[in-house]
Structure formats: C-alpha cells, structure tokens
Amino acid sequence: MINRTHASDVGPEDDGETVEVSGWAHEIRDLGGITFIVIRDRGGSIQATFKEDRSPELFEKAQQVGKEDVVTVTGEVEESGQAPGDRELVPENLEIVSEAESPLPLDVSKDIDSDLSTRLDNRFMDLRQPEVHSVFSLRSHLMESMEEWFDENGY
C-alpha cells in the first residue's frame, strides 16, 4: 500500500519505501536528460528526480510542470547526499493536480523584494514564503499555549 505523507515526514529511515507526496512545485531545474523538481508542502520539501533514460514518459510529463503547480508524485525514497534533506524520490508516477497562473505575481522560491501593494494583492502567494508563514505559525502556537495555560489555571 502506498503511504501518502508530508515531505517533512520522509526521512532516511524510509529508504526503499514507496510514498506519495503532494505539494507545490517549488523549484524546477532542467539539466538536459535529468529534471529535478523540489516539491514543497506545509511541512517541508523533497526533491523528485526525473531521468529521461529511466522513464521517457515521466520525463516528458515533468517537462510540463510549471513553478507553483500543484503536483502529486509517487515514488521510492532514496538516500542521496546531494539532494536537499539527504533524500529524494525516484518517481513512479506524476500527476499535475492544478496548474498555476503564469507569470506568477510573486516568486516564492527566490528572495525578490516586492512592494507592499503587490504583496497584499497577492497575499495567498506571499504567505507561502517561509519567513512570512513562520510569523503566523509562531503566533498560532503562542495563542494556543496561552489558551491552554488559562484553561489549566481556571481562567
């Protein structure tokens, strides 16, 4: 049975396991006969490596993936010292769930400054940036802890 998981839950101990990861195509690098797609979800990211000589059909499909498209990749986890997080997916299946508008109003993967009005008009994209997301995540955890403390102390 295929195990649907978050990228952050895939570790070296999963080497050889088949998993399914869904998320945004955060970064795409095409090096001729090999394409790397970094898939980002709410927990982290993992790299999928598509090789033309391994599966021409999957390689062709990977060529159609655009930045911030929502994808689902099923594949075997392989330990790799060169991949981000020291693990990568050797894909068996790739599904493009949803295509992003092109061109993107903001680039989530790069450190490009945008003016405030652009960021506010495209807040859904702005919140995907790790620095912006972490502020709201921290606030949420802080509020949760405060609420728990008040409950435990009878307030």
Regions found by a protein language model. Give the residues of each.
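Class II aminoacyl-tRNA synthetase catalytic cores and aaRS-like
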Residues: M1-Y155
